[in-house]
């Protein structure tokens, strides 16, 4: 952000209050679609999705769009005329996509400035390893073995768009920008419904930003109450965005409850609480009794319904006892497993045996849900029996083999932290047999005849990749003893959920 502050012709105070003029500056569009700002996005920018502008940035589109924005009536297109209205070879959908991406970049400016100002004079530890999804599980292994219950809930998404717009009012003071954004947002959703059957590519950046802002509102209140009620003062709340009218909103929030503020804190008082969130799921682990966990459940339901005006069904909040129930989180089934140990102790001439029980976090692969995902992608049938991938038979043999091997390695990479590898071998078997049946179908042969003519080289492709990586990490003696297949391995380079997990 410091690199681009020279382009902004406002000082720090005016940037927060006057964002609307930035919509009419051409250099903002250049920054919004700069490859440096979009290198983390897996989709190419919409300027390069069109065949007419696939080689260079078109400033003509931006200039014509700015002229159109001076007259907002020209941006309003009836839904029935969306497909017929073209402007320079594009429909109005194309220009609303540009505005939505631009607004996401502009509105992030005051957020970035406030976040940077809150970090001034503080030393924050930066670690790229903490970005990995697998970094959560070592934390769970250390903490969850001492807890009894876990509160598992799905954070509700606001149904009405106006709730998301109201979230920005506490941070963006420019009324013109808010009105313009509200207008574009409703128009955006109108042609989103119109083009839903045509699978139009819609940039989700602005909706992701609004949803994260909505989550920050919820977590700021939760951590505030958590800090006030806890005996152990937590400092993790400092990484949240700076609040505007925060304490006034807290006072309004307290009016929802019949009891007073100390009574509410008394219900939530527990020094041993751990909170983990990823996307729309969050879990709350504690040593509380079932009664106190139900009070936490009551608190979350009232928080969303009374303060955020979002309907929240209590059925979406599950209270799991880790020693009996499985917790499905990030594609794993987690539970506590009792590991009995017998220790022999000798004192002088007397010896005796001591039975110790060690609690370990057991992480298993949800084979049933993954089998349904494989069946949905036509790798197997509903019973889990491998079938050929008919849509891939037009590709070359090497392309088919590389696709299956890549999927198999990604699954092995993601589920390497499983405590029981039998289900992982079952998934590999389904993919390997599906690959063989696909190649046999392409060559119009049987599986037996195809394997007999090809030899064992095909099956080795599914085994060499992961084993070669592990042999470079672990000592040769450890690798040769086959203990490697019984331990859990967490990788710190996994930034996205596996596609098979996203199906659920």
From Swiss-Prot:
UniProt subcellular location: Plastid, Chloroplast
Signal sequence, renumbered to the chain: none
GO terms of biological process kind: mRNA processing; RNA splicing; tRNA processing
A molecular-function term among this protein's GO annotations: RNA binding
GO CC terms: chloroplast
Cross-referenced Pfam families: Intron_maturas2, MatK_N
Keywords: Chloroplast, mRNA processing, Plastid, RNA-binding, tRNA processing
Domain of life of the organism encoding this protein: Eukaryota
Alphabetized PANTHER family for the sequence: MATURASE K
Family stated for the protein in its record: Belongs to the intron maturase 2 family. MatK subfamily.
Function: Usually encoded in the trnK tRNA gene intron. Probably assists in splicing its own and other chloroplast group II introns.
Name of the molecule in the record: Maturase K
Organism: Lepidium virginicum
Gene name of the record: matK
